[in-house]
Amino acid sequence: MNMPLLDIQPRTLQFAVDLKKQTSCVVQLTNTTHHYVAFKVKTTSPKKYCVRPNVGVVAPKSTCEFTVIMQAFKEPPPDMVCKDKFLIQSTAVSAETTDEDITASMFSKAEGKHIEENKLRVTLVPPSDSPELSPINTPKQGAVFEDSILKDRLYSQSETLAPPQYEGEIVKEPRMVGHDELKAADNAKELKTPKMATVDFVEDRYTANDLKATKDSYDSSRMAKETGFDPIRSHKDADDGRAIKATTNLDAPMKKAMDLPRDQGFTNGIAVDSEPKISKERDVVQLQKTDGQNVRGLDELKLVKDIEEMKLKVDALESKLKQADSTISKLMEERSISSQHRQSLQHELAELRTKKIVKEVHNGFPLLYVCVVAFIAYVIGHFLRT
């Protein structure tokens, strides 16, 4: 396999140094082969970065993306030099392989597999060099407004577009557009307003699903009183000479973005659609619920297995107890039999002893018998002599 398995873009990960805020970088993997390719991402500082997802399978001639999130800096670094690196390991796998089937052994070189490794460097850039959205009044994203169409949806504040938000990423606060920037934009290009105006924006930067016009109607004087913004003149209407006013205040905090419908015109405030964020939050909640259900199911399965194992152990103990009872009863019977046999032996031994004593007594004549016989013989002899 001389041809590389994956084409990785970018080769250098750039992170903006921003205190107390997370920054992220998206890496795109392109499978240039006709095989399914599994990849795994490693880093030299796992506590500092979060990779989502860190493993995956890329289909032939397709692309896959993963996001690298850098944790927020607690204090500014002394220099902008970063020695952290990322290692992307990739290998060809079968078409049936899923993300759950990927293990560390798949990327082991001991089995003789072809493992491709690509290293990515990390560079730190100041926050000013990080990509930010341009003001809404620039010529590239300028829009033509019709006062007769937008008079009921006029806002008295100017807003900028927020950058797209990835999962687990903290989005930076949008930057307010000041008087100087608006004047410079007006001097650079004067916007003429026909009666039926449309909104022109760059499609390659933001799609139609990301931008919406407002549905609600606000009073411009009321909003100006509440926010305290200074009014600035932007464009004049060709018919009745009325000007669309947009206000901004560099010291005031940014309000939340306006929710604008697709089929209507824009006022001076344009905001990113919140539906993807809500859908992502719903997906996260659903994933958490499914994870909780899976965890509960696994816990229940473990509990059932433990109960079955306990039942098997109890049955084994009961069988052992029965065997012990049977052996104890056998031993008791043997003990009673042995005691009876012992008693019989003792009785026989006593009988043998009594028989031996009787035999010993009957050997010879008794002393009384001898005395009587001697006395009778003496009497008979005395009478015979006389």
From Swiss-Prot:
Q: Which residues carry this modification: Phosphoserine?
A: 279
Q: Name one GO biological process term.
A: intracellular transport
Q: Which residues form the MSP domain?
A: 5-125
Entry superkingdom: Eukaryota
Where does the record place a coiled coil?
300-353
Cytoplasmic-side positions: 1-363
Q: Which residues carry this modification: N-acetylmethionine?
A: 1
Q: Where are the transmembrane segments?
A: 364-384
- Compartments in which it is found: Endoplasmic reticulum membrane
Its GO CC terms? endoplasmic reticulum membrane; extracellular region; plasma membrane
Q: Does the keyword Transmembrane helix apply?
A: yes
Q: How does the protein's chain sit in the membrane according to the entry?
A: Single-pass type IV membrane protein
One family from Pfam that matches here is Motile_Sperm
> Does the UniProt entry include the keyword NAD?
no
- Please give the family membership noted in the entry: Belongs to the VAMP-associated protein (VAP) (TC 9.B.17) family.
Q: What's the subunit arrangement here?
A: Interacts with cowpea mosaic virus (CPMV) NTP-binding protein (NTB).
Q: What is this protein called?
A: Vesicle-associated protein 2-2
Q: What is the lineage of its organism?
A: Eukaryota, Viridiplantae, Streptophyta, Embryophyta, Tracheophyta
